Swiss-Prot record:
Description of post-translational modifications: Late in virus-infected cells, may be cleaved from a 56-kDa protein to a 53-kDa protein by a cellular caspase. This cleavage might be a marker for the onset of apoptosis in infected cells or have a specific function in virus host interaction.
Protein's UniProt name: Nucleoprotein
Annotated motif Unconventional nuclear localization signal, positions: 1-18
Xref: Pfam families: Flu_NP
Length: 498
């Protein structure tokens, strides 16, 4: 694990990177949450939403998406320059759901982006408050991670769908900054790099000229971000090789896929933060809670406490199970899509099931879905314990694995052995150790071979009672090892489509 000297904490990424003490960081993150809350309250007023409608997660997603779209400079420029029929580049909107005569109705709203930007800035003391925007992007990304399995995207870049535990943050926009880069999984970074290299192979001018220089520096920056996620010298050396390549091509793609596979056992450090929907922050601010004054952290007890006291509702389709919908959103709130289900069940206090066993589709409702049969219900987002989020990959460990996901990416800093299917993973590493990176490959394979199943990760770390705000009495959980640990277990989750 890199020393704290070289890596800023997430809260510092979330703030402006100035070195701050814990109190300043908590106040600064609190200020960001206050801004989102104030914006949400104002939008609910504009849209004339009742209290219940304002707590509907589908309305929250639409409002969040509107402000993200209003601030998407590149896309806005693109829309101005490439006008498409029936799309006004200056407007943004989406479906808002209201309760009319005992039925849920969909209403499409349209606003000037300029107006949305004005409301957002006003809620954030005149600032653009990019951190608040990034926070919402990460919440959307975490929701996508729990809802969809990115099989197709993995296969397209030549990776294996069973590597899905490496794909955290794969739907985050490019513009999500340092805080966004921190939460991206190893597989996500590898996929972005492979896409880039493939473009270079197909387009002679990709690395050339004025633009090519920018492209090259973006490539090297991404390589460095990925290198920073790896915890072993050999994996990092391999990233140096990829970064320094004069003309990145298939050899680099091979190396990248190799390093991604190795991360199933020699896991990278990926940050986890509990980012909640705006409809949680809004009512809290409305009730008079001052996040800046009280201080807030995305990686401690605060999000758990907030969810203990929040009412959030969701639209439910006719054959969906509200408890399953709740689990989906709960996992998203805690950035836990790739965490061990045995641990999640312990923290939540109710059984957390694999994605394929859940009778629920995504949270968003498509525009062609019939509203007549829509019901709504309360999402159960409370927990039995809380635990500190981690950005370490933990030590490695193995367990009987599923046909689907064959490793986990820990979200909580809690003692356990980390499951992965060693025989399946190692089978992919036969014989391919030639070429420039052969010594590193051999070293990486040696370390993977040496990974022990019984090794504990996060030794001595436990979960805490919700009354234990200072984390003084850790409860080290015991697990039923016979249970399945993987969420995307031989899975049939829907595919994510833009």
């Amino acid at each position: 694990m890199a020393s704290q000297g070289t890596k800023r904490s997430y809260e510092q990424m979330e703030t402006d990177g100035e070195r701050q003490n814990a109190t300043e960081i908590r106040a600064s993150v609190g200020r960001m949450i206050d801004g989102i809350g104030r914006f949400y309250i104002q939008m609910c007023t504009e849209l004339k939403l009742s209290d219940y409608e304002g707590r509907l997660i589908q309305n929250s997603l639409t409002i969040e998406r509107m402000v993200l779209s209003a601030f998407d400079e590149r896309r806005n420029r693109y829309l101005e320059e490439h006008p498409s029929a029936g799309k006004d580049p200056k407007k943004t909107g989406g479906p808002i759901y209201k309760r009319v005569d005992g039925k849920w109705m969909r209403e499409l709203v349209l606003y000037d982006k300029e107006e949305i930007r004005r409301i957002w800035r006003q809620a954030n003391n005149g600032d653009d408050a990019t951190r608040g925007l990034t926070h919402m992007m990460i919440w959307h990304s975490n929701l996508n991670d729990t809802t969809y399995q990115r099989t197709r995207a993995l296969v397209r870049t030549g990776m294996d769908p069973r590597m899905c535990s490496l794909m955290q943050g794969s739907t985050l926009p490019r513009r999500s900054g340092a805080a966004g880069a921190a939460v991206k999984g190893v597989g996500t970074m590898v996929m972005e790099l492979i896409r880039m290299i493939k473009r270079g192979i197909n387009d002679r001018n990709f690395w050339r000229g004025e633009n090519g220089r920018k492209t090259r520096s973006a490539y090297e920056r991404m390589c460095n971000i990925l290198k920073g996620k790896f915890q072993t010298a050999a994996q990092r050396a391999m990233m140096d090789q990829v970064r320094e390549s004069r003309n990145p091509g298939n050899a680099e793609i091979e190396d990248l896929i190799f390093s991604a596979r190795s991360a199933l056992i020699l896991r990278g450090s990926v940050a986890h933060k509990s980012c909640l929907p705006a409809c949680v922050y809004g009512p809290a601010v409305a009730s008079g809670y001052n996040f800046e004054k009280e201080g807030y952290s995305l990686v401690g007890i605060d999000p758990f406490k907030l969810l203990q006291n929040s009412q959030v509702y969701s639209l439910i389709r006719p054959n969906e199970n509200p408890a399953h919908k709740s689990q989906l959103v709960w996992m998203a709130c805690h950035s836990a899509a790739f965490e061990d289900l045995r641990l999640l069940s312990f923290i939540r206090g109710t059984k957390v099931s694999p994605r394929g066993k859940l009778s629920t589709r995504g949270v968003q409702i498509a525009s062609n879905e019939n509203m007549d049969t829509m019901e709504s219900s309360t999402l159960e987002l409370r927990s039995r314990y809380w635990a500190i989020r981690t950005r370490s990959g933990g030590n490695t460990n193995q367990q009987r694995a599923s046909a689907g996901q064959i490793s986990v990416q820990p979200a909580f800093s809690v003692q356990r052995n980390l499951p992965f299917d060693k025989s399946t993973i190692m089978a992919a590493f036969t014989g391919n150790t030639e070429g420039r990176t052969s010594d590193m490959r051999a070293e990486i394979i040696r370390m993977m071979e040496g990974a022990k199943p019984e090794e504990m990760s996060f030794r001595g770390r436990g979960v805490f009672e919700l009354s234990d705000e200072k984390a003084t009495n850790p409860v080290v959980p015991s697990f039923d090892m016979s249970n399945e640990g993987s969420y995307f277990f031989g899975d049939n989750a829907e595919e994510y489509d833009n």
